[in-house]
């Protein structure tokens, strides 16, 4: 039986964070929200829903929020850490798919890959994800179809072996690279991507794809320094 702490980085997500926390809490031992300098009621909504809330006084970026959260959750008695977004792009109802794969598969690193219809998202975002995922797959030697997905379940002991430095969304790629290099057996499950009113990704497709490519190249040609 695995025990799970959920880590949710949030920036100005008062509209959906409570719903995400409540949906997540049904499947995990503890839910931790990192309020990354929000100027709205994100922290209050998360607390009302039952989450432990850690707060940045100003916006430092998703990577910084994830690293703050990891410092906290890796000190808790949890065998795995679940990562998901606060904006409802990741359906908490899909969490059991990741848990089941962790319990009955290898269980090191389970990546929730979203179902994408080409016409269901902006072209720039779609193509940036495809290109970034193909490049990353080639350089790490493991097939990845959705490298930008932050929906993932990872063994705590493995996370303690790596040092993450990313401040922005590139931390998703950095995590994949460093954990695979540390020996993680990567497993993938297909998860439903929610469509909701007012959906707007904070990812900048061209900038973040460039960073993905640079990280992959650094891993390939300078493995001791990346």
Q: What name fits each language-model region?
A:
Residues 35-44, 88:
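A conserved acidic beta->alpha catalytic loop
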